[in-house]
């Protein structure tokens, strides 16, 4: 059946990253990947519905939650990134952007902060709600498919939190470590001397859309 074929393909795919993990962790990797793809959702209750396990739903949710709480192991992350590297072109382009996850009705979420809600804000009006910042870095594969190489949810309310720039630098360093040389593409929100200096320090090429009030000095001439 189509379901069986899909499960086999996902199992083969996830084995590339979970080969060195324990048996329960390998099962979790396959279950969560299949469940999200089959349900089109990241809600654990929806994922459970697709797994059709004999255990009670709440027990399956608890099992998945425990594994998620552990995070992604270093070995699985390394195996994933090496696979992504094989999919990329010889001249990789890395896209970095910030987004937000809004939780307006949340009260018990850990380190819940205040973020600018991108879906409701405009160029003349900013709408702020409870939520988290998300920093994402991805590349285009040789088949022009976007694939993540860095993804982090963060909040200024976290203990020992430094700045959003610190997270962006981590994304840049991840790309630099993985590819050695790449072209970084970023929106006007990254029009910042700190970004230019960081990318220059690493010897990377970059394309950053400038803000309208940016003054550019080129060959001793100022361009506005």
What do the PLM-derived regions correspond to, one by one?
Residues 152-222:
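An internal, acidic/charged active-site-proximal segment
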Residues 89-91, 132-134, 146, 179-182, ...:
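A general structural motif
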Residues 1-8, 12, 16:
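Intrinsically disordered, low-complexity and often Lys/Arg-enriched segments
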Residues 59, 142-149:
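Short, flexible active-site-proximal loops enriched in glycine and acidic residues
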Residues 61-142:
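Active-site-proximal, Lys/Arg-enriched surface segment
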Residues 47, 93-102, 137, 183-191, ...:
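Short, conserved catalytic/metal-binding motifs centered on acidic residues
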Residues 16, 20-75:
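Short, positively charged, Gly/Tyr-enriched micro-motifs
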Residues 100-103, 142-145, 156-158, 191:
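A short acidic, glycine/proline-enriched capping/turn motif at secondary-structure boundaries
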């Amino acid at each position: 059946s189509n379901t069986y074929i899909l499960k086999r393909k996902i199992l083969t795919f996830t084995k590339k990253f979970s080969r060195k993990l324990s048996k329960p962790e390998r099962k979790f990797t396959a279950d969560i990947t299949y469940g999200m793809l089959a349900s089109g959702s990241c809600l654990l209750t929806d994922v459970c519905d697709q797994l059709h396990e004999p255990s009670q739903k709440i027990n399956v949710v608890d099992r998945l939650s425990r594994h998620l709480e552990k995070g992604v192991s270093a070995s699985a992350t390394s195996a994933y990134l090496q696979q992504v590297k094989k999919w990329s072109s010889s001249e990789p382009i890395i896209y970095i952007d910030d987004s937000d996850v809004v939780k307006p009705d949340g009260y018990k979420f850990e380190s819940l902060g205040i973020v600018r809600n991108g879906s409701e804000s405009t160029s003349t009006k900013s709408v702020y709600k409870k939520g988290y910042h998300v920093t994402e870095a991805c590349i285009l594969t040789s088949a022009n498919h976007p694939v993540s190489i860095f993804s982090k949810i963060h909040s200024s309310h976290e203990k020992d939190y430094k700045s959003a720039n610190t997270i962006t630098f981590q994304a840049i360093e991840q790309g630099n470590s993985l590819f050695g040389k790449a072209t970084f593409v970023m929106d006007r929100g990254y029009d910042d001397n700190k970004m230019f200096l960081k990318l220059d320090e690493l010897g990377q090429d970059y394309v950053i859309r400038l803000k309208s009030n940016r003054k550019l000095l080129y060959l001793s001439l100022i361009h506005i």
